[in-house]
Amino acid sequence: YFIDGYHGGIYGHYPVGQTAFIAQKLRQNPNWNINIEIEPESWEVVRQRDPEGYEAFKRLFKDQSVESGRIEYVNPTYAQSYFFGTSGESAIRQFEYGMRLIQKHFPEAVFTTYSAEEPCFTSCLPYILKSFGFSYASTKNPNTMWGGYVSAYGGELVNWVGPDGTRLTTVPRYACEDLQPGSCWQSISWFNTKDYIHKCLDTGIQHPVGMCIQDAAWSHGWDKGPWLGQDTAAYYTPTAYKTWRNYIQDCSVGTTQDDWHFSQEDVLGGLMWGTQVMQRLAGEVRVAENAIVRAEKMAAYARLYKGMEWLTERIDEGWRTLLLSQHHDCWIVPYNQLQGKKTWAETVTDWTGVTNQNSR
């Protein structure tokens, strides 16, 4: 089995025509199913600049059933945050604001499995995910390990146990899932090679799965559609492309007694956290996190005891810019230009500045 799909958005990478491209490839490949993590703000931009592609994608997305649905939204967070460098409240708001915006464009969206192409993981996720209605997760990120990855543990399924004891059925980065030889940014599950599948089978994994959530960048080399390609000699056959929920519910062993007591030490960050720019970004984000939460508390007191107006738009915009400042690209490519203008690091200063201003 293989997990394919697309990762990106208007802040990271989402060229004009990307939505129409995905819809076209789905029509051309009826046995191809995908998993997506697209920044939620992208959809309003797509609706305006590519209405035909937008509507074609919406028609394909509408079927959210486990058996016949072809698209699963696996990371609905507002800005695909790494989580392990921010607060628990920020993690909650990433999901709350992201899911709310996605459902404006896709009211039938069902959020079943959490998965990410980047190392967007933290120890408290089982509780947060379950509170938002998720049933499953995966801790694989085999093709984008520059920012880090989680510990290798277990077999086909594990119960990811958070610090509060919450359990979530999860496809882990298998104990046998080593880094790709000669690479520090890929694991061997990035492509369903015969060696990878046989290694899994030999360790008792009955239904092994590989994964690559491709960059949403069809005009920049990511334009082949199904990741494994047409040359079946290059990978293990038969291989079926699945949504995560279809794989876990209908193809995997389904349940497990293997409890993985996941701690923050299982998040193996690969960023240069000691650099000055990282320290500055982390400080700016933390100041803004504290400011917006403090402002919400005071606004609640003012509402309850003084009957003052609840400033919904001001608070929401403060959270929006804070969530964007936690985008993984702010941390992994801080000196790259964002949309050809300021760098990501400079934009974090702007975004957190709005949050701080709105918190006063």
List where the protein language model places each region.
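Catalytic-domain carbohydrate-binding cleft regions of carbohydrate-active enzymes
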Residues: Y1-R360
